[in-house]
Swiss-Prot record:
The keyword GTP-binding applies. Its cofactor is Mg(2+). Homodimer. It comes from the Bacteria. GO terms for biological process: 'de novo' AMP biosynthetic process; IMP metabolic process. Its main location: cytoplasm. This is Adenylosuccinate synthetase. Pfam families: Adenylsucc_synt. The lineage of its organism: Bacteria, Bacillati, Cyanobacteriota, Cyanophyceae, Nostocales. Substrate binds at T298, T299, T300, G301, R302, K303, R304. SMART domains: Adenylsucc_synt (SM00788).
């Protein structure tokens, strides 16, 4: 039995969907613990592409129980569309469970999110406009609507009468938008409630029961460490906690019950939206990575900014999340390059900095210090073992592992399940030893 968290070690879009899908083969339960429809994951199975925003990746395995935890915010309209899409493809959704205490994104959340971003002008933060931030804001202000409220028509109508009255003041007076009709919103969301009712349970209790029965549980995060509300590049962050610690809060699980943490990083770095990005590449090289990596957002379709691998944020993600091992994705995107650069440290105002600065203003002044490695310039997408990789690619992976001081357990070389090298068992492998008895760093790349 193992309880494993999968987290993004960069700014999201690292390939967590594929890695979670792979690991779901060994999982009895897959749980999504934070975020909402502002994140998406793409899974390719036997040439068929699935794009999901709320439903956990494990839904493609018929015997795997999938849960949406209390730390997520749920847009019922999107969730029902995903259910309908899967069922139209004869994929069963009967094993999907939804936390009754998860908060619900309402129409006024989306309207306020978009209007607020437009009002920011040059100070925009790059929101997806899906209402995620305002939903979490209402949760913090204790005025939010939870899934269990949808199940009680009288309670929903009473709560929305007060809430929409207040939200209409904001929509009309601040943003010059038309008001919402309370009864129309109530009717719409009661319809959603009936469709979702069979899936709604106390997921925290279900998770605890699965642990008692010694089931393998996989906790799936959305976005990435550098988008974490507390530990990311604030204010250019999301409104929840994608880091490993968020899995406990977002599911109702005690921290002593977590066995392993697996981080996912691309072999280079990408970012969507606003905010500092020290290794960002402009010009032809950035375009090459974007084209070869198909770097367009699953949720918004926005073009992702591309850059070299940043080991400074990599080490930070290892530390913040207590990672036991890493999965490196999209190694094949680098196949054509003659040289590859890796950021090993920053220079800030003439001084070397080996650690991630907590100030976004200071981070914006960081200039990357690079180490240049030779490329391999041969295709790797058909490699299935470490021995199949060209030596330069293997050297590159070893260098990343040394810089981040964590083993690499999985190497992904394409979108399909079979385009993967499993270096060590990421679920049942050993806990990471920080140091050997003699004080030297622990094993870096298992082989």
């Amino acid at each position: 039995m193992a309880n494993v968290i999968v987290i993004g070690a960069q700014w999201g879009d690292e390939g967590k969907g594929k890695i979670t899908d792979l690991l779901s083969r060994s999982a009895d339960v897959v749980v999504r613990y934070q975020g909402g429809v502002n994140a998406g994951h793409t899974i390719v199975v036997k040439g068929q592409t699935f794009k999901l925003h709320l439903i956990p990746s494990g839904i493609l395995y018929p015997d795997t129980e999938c849960m949406i935890g209390c730390g997520t915010v749920i847009d019922p309209q999107v969730l029902i569309k995903e259910l309908d899409q899967l069922e139209s493809l004869n994929i069963s959704t009967k094993n999907l469970l939804i936390s009754e205490t998860a908060h619900v994104t309402m129409p006024y959340h989306r309207l306020i999110d978009k209007a607020s971003e437009e009002r920011r002008g040059s100070h925009k933060i790059g929101t997806t406009g899906r209402g995620i931030g305002p939903t979490y804001a209402d949760k913090s202000e204790r005025t939010g609507i939870r899934v269990l409220d949808l199940m009680d028509p009288a309670a929903l109508r009473d709560q929305l009468a007060w809430t929409i009255n207040n939200k209409n003041l904001i929509l009309e007076k601040l943003y010059n938008l038309p008001p919402l009709d309370t009864e129309e919103v109530v009717k719409e969301y009661l319809g959603y409630a009936e469709r979702l009712r069979p899936h709604v349970v106390d997921t925290s209790l279900k998770i605890y029961d699965a642990i008692q029965r010694r089931r393998n549980i996989l906790f799936e995060g959305a976005q990435g460490t550098l988008l974490d509300l507390d530990h990311g590049t604030y204010p250019y962050v999301t409104s929840s906690n994608p880091v490993a610690g968020g899995a406990c809060v977002g599911t109702g699980l005690g921290p002593t019950m977590i066995d392993r943490v697996i981080g996912v990083s691309k072999a280079y770095t990408t970012r969507v939206g606003e905010g500092p990005f020290p290794t960002e590449l402009d010009g032809e090289l950035g375009e090459l990575l974007c084209d070869r990596g198909a770097e367009f957002g699953t949720t918004t379709g926005r073009k992702r900014r591309c850059g070299w691998f940043d080991a400074v944020i990599g080490r930070y993600a290892v530390r913040i999340n207590g990672m036991d091992c890493m999965a490196i994705t999209k190694l094949d995107v680098l196949d054509e390059l003659e040289e590859i650069q890796v950021c090993i440290a920053y220079e800030i105002d003439g001084d070397r900095c080996d650690h991630f600065p907590t100030s976004a203003r200071q981070f914006a002044r960081c200039r990357p210090i690079y180490k240049t490695l030779p490329g391999w310039q041969v295709p790797t997408s058909e490699c299935r073992t470490l021995e199949d990789l060209p030596q330069q690619a293997l050297d590159y992976l070893k260098f990343l592992a040394e810089l981040m001081e964590v083993p690499i357990a999985i190497v992904s070389l394409g979108a399909s399940r079979d385009q993967t090298i499993i270096v060590e068992d990421p679920i049942h492998g050993p806990k990471r030893a920080l140091l050997h008895p003699d004080g030297t760093p622990a094993s870096l790349l298992s082989a």
